[in-house]
Amino acid sequence: MASIVSVGFDQLEEELLTMADSSGRIAKAALYDGADFMADKLRAATENLQVEDRRRKRSKNVLDYEKEALLNGLTIEKFRDDRARDCVQTSITFHGYSDHETEDYPGGVPAIILARAIIAGTVFRVKNRFFPNAFNRNKKEAEMIMVKKAESEMQKILK
C-alpha cells in the first residue's frame, strides 16, 4: 500500500496560527503607513490650489481663508475595526471651520463644505477635482506601500 509522508506541516500550522493572531496588528501597521503617505499627497494637492485675493466670476481659484481652512482641517480619522466586514478602516477628510462667517454659518463655513464646493463646483466656481485626482493618482503607490509594510511585519513575526 502506498503511503505519504509529510514533513513540516506542524511548523506551517504554528506559523499560520501566529499570523492569524497578529493579523489585526499587521493590518493596522500597513494601513497607518498607507494613510500617512496618502495624507501627504492630499496635503500637497491642497497646497497647490491657486489663491486669489477676491472672488471673481466663475473662478477655478480659491480664496486664502478657504485654502487655510482646508490645510488646517485635513486629518486622518481614527482607525475603526469593522467587524461586519472583518477589516480595519480609516478615512482622510476635512474637519473644522474657516474664519469666514456667513449668514448661514455664523461660526464659520465647515471645511468639508468648502472642499465639496471646490470639487463639485458652484454657480460662481468652476469645479476643481483636486482631492479625487490626487487620490486616484497615488492609490496604486499607497497600496504598494501597504503591501510592503505588511510583508515586513509578517517577516518580523516569523523570525
Segment roles from a protein language model:
Residues 1-25:
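N-terminal, Lys/Arg- and Ser/Thr-rich interaction peptides
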Residues 119-136:
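Short helix/strand-capping connector loops at secondary-structure junctions
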Residues 13, 41, 83, 134-135, ...:
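Prokaryotic Sec-type signal peptides and long signal-anchor helices
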Residues 17, 21-122, 152, 158-159:
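Short, low-complexity, charged/polar segments at coil/turn and helix-coil boundaries
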